[in-house]
Amino acid sequence: MRLLSFIALCGIVMMFTACSNEDVAQGSVETNTANNDNLTTFVTGNPATRTSLNYDDGAFFWESGDYIYVQDDNGTWHKSSNAPTEKTASFKFKVPGKYTDHTSYKVYYPGKQGINNNVTISASQLQKTPNSTAHIGEVGDCGTADATGGNGVFNFRLDHQAAILVFQPFTENDAVKNCYLTKIEVTSDNDITGTYTLDTTTGELTGSGSGKTITMTTKGDGSYAQGFPLKTSSANVATNGTYVVIRPGTHALTVRYWIKDYVTQVEGAVTKTYPAFDYEKNDYYDMTANLNVTDYDGTKYYMWDAENNYWNGHEWNSAAPWQPVLKDKDNSNYPKSGSDSCYYRSTEGIGRDDAKYSCKKLPNANELAWYAEKGDARWDGERIWTTMGHLYKGGMWFKNKAFIKLTESFSESYGPGFYGDMRDNWGMISKSVAQGAPVGFFAERYFFLPALGSYSVGYLYKIGEEGCYWSSSAGNNNSNCGYMLEFNKNTVSVNTTGSDVGYYVMEFE
């Protein structure tokens, strides 16, 4: 994690043309604009001054709508009567009040949503273009300075009181590179957002904020209307650098990176955790993350025990693709006869018949029954995954074989309960499922099966809605069928189906 200081040096020239004779109760804000003779000029002349920053060198600039606040000799708060109208390296602020009694005055920048020394770090933040910091003054960046000097000339070095996280997600998954970053949710173990006060003595943020979560939306106009791109295989601040303002301090963070595939219309989050770390004021921190979404091989759809996959030679990523990659799309060039090596292996449906080719290493019918009956099947509609160049979500969690064996007689030779050996005698199971991913100490003893759908007569059916997985056991209740495990958000079942459908081939844990 790189951190860079962004202390900015500012100069103030205070030109006392007249003293204000207006008495205003302490705590109110005076913004006299009627007569410039009653104003003091605060000049910021350093080219690296304030409220937006350059990532590479830490240079700051004033942005449109930036105001400063100063307490005068009477203790009255005064807001500058003017502000920049565009990004600028220097600006002459006009500030009402009397400033002749002291050689030091504290200057406050409470952000664009603040007043006097009151600061709001927003729970909802918005950045419209990558690697832009024009918004940080809007969402809680703030600062103070002790202006010292005399004879009408005062200088100060602005001390920023917030911390900034610079998120730079990347991915090695080509399907994720086709997606966009739509928002980032940052959740802390303590407060990072809310209303705070800039202490009049130390200048630091004080008080307890009201929120532990900040949501940064990463959408703008034009080419960024859908979000920020995710096209790089390593961190690149120019591509999608996102700046989130937080309260400084020691925080353990959980970050959810929300991404969306606008072809499938699937949106979901990749979660990363960052251990407790002291995010100091006046600094910004690189928060890089590899969005390593699991990708499932689109060439693993087979008819039961076929020698080659359903679209062999014309897979989705081949030179001459026939394979549909989106739900309800089809291609008529699917396998149609036994002479095709992509066609299923013919079976008689009498007694046991074990797979010889593509399904040979898969769980058999008995094992599928154990997973369905005793595997605590849990539907997870939020887990995202990719296949064939696109983002999808949804699937089922099951206890792994070793975990089931701790309490059950998991066996390859017979099914649970009264089923006996389902390879010899037909049986079927259908059960309701629980909802949500497993949590707690034993969560790591589960494995996930994505809802990869299936192919039938060339159509891709219910991807993201159903999971359909072959076993190594042919059906014994009819010819040319095979045992399979099938699930959706409500049920999980083990049964036989026609061998001519393209189900997924995967070894289970």
Regions found by a protein language model. Give the residues of each.
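Sec-type signal peptide cleavage vicinity
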Residues: R2-E373, W379-G381, T387
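C-terminal, surface-exposed recognition/capping segments
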Residues: W385-M388, Y392-E509
